[in-house]
Amino acid sequence: MNPITMKLVVDDLILQALREDITFEDVSTASVCPTARPATVELIAKADGIIAGLDVFARTFELLDPQSSVLFDVADGDEVHAGDHVGQVRGDARVLLSGERVALNYLQRMSGIATYTHQMAAALEGTKTVLVDTRKTTPGMRVFEKAAVEIGGGSNHRYNLSTAVMLKDNHIDAAGGVARAIEMARAHASFTTTVEIECENLDMVREAVEVGADIIMFDNMTHDDMAAAIELIDGRAKTECSGNVDADNIRALADLGVDFISSGALTHSAPILDLSLKHLRLLDGK
């Protein structure tokens, strides 16, 4: 992850998660480790998948104690298998025990998203279609989840509401129609801002093309209607398919010739990748 992003955004989010988990005291750790004791603990994969979030994992321990260190056997984007040794954390035993759950929560979540994204992106090989995520992210986790999508081989759609214009059904209703919504967006937003509009039928697509939308999203349209829409657009706008996308239908959608396929499932439905910290070893011989 970008070091500036890590410092300005990610550190605060990790600290918030640590405060949520530790609050006043880790009573379990304080009971068995009342004083500082050097130790190591091993990071082990318990399932097959793609690793993502190693820097966030390491940073969690560093924020608790700058003297903590992590040595990894893999890098973000690498494939791991059940039983693989992924890395070792070294530091005060109290820090290793207290930071374990938060660090693993980030790593498991990000690795799960990267794994699912990798599986979906693999189905698009040989096509021009780019797999993108959505804003359907866990509150407070967007920066991590979108980073995981990229590590898994996908791309990011707009990061937040200020990044691009995305006119959905309620925006169109509020504006009074497709053409009016696009015209109002052009008048308000910077000339550098991309204007995308969601269309549910061919009439909406035709109107969006005529007014000059940059990207036209086909929202839950039939396969035949999307094929007709792409022919109608004829390269005058980028095209995006969204809605009910899964591993079973993503290739057929890409074969239509759409530029982008967006899937909220990348972030809201990906299962975690099972990882564990095991075999804590005290180094002071006591």
What spans do the regions from the language model cover?
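Basic/polar N-terminal segments that are highly enriched at the extreme N-terminus
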Residues: 1-4, 284-286
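Short secondary-structure boundary segments
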Residues: 220, 243, 264-265
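Short, charged, intrinsically disordered terminal tails
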Residues: 265-286
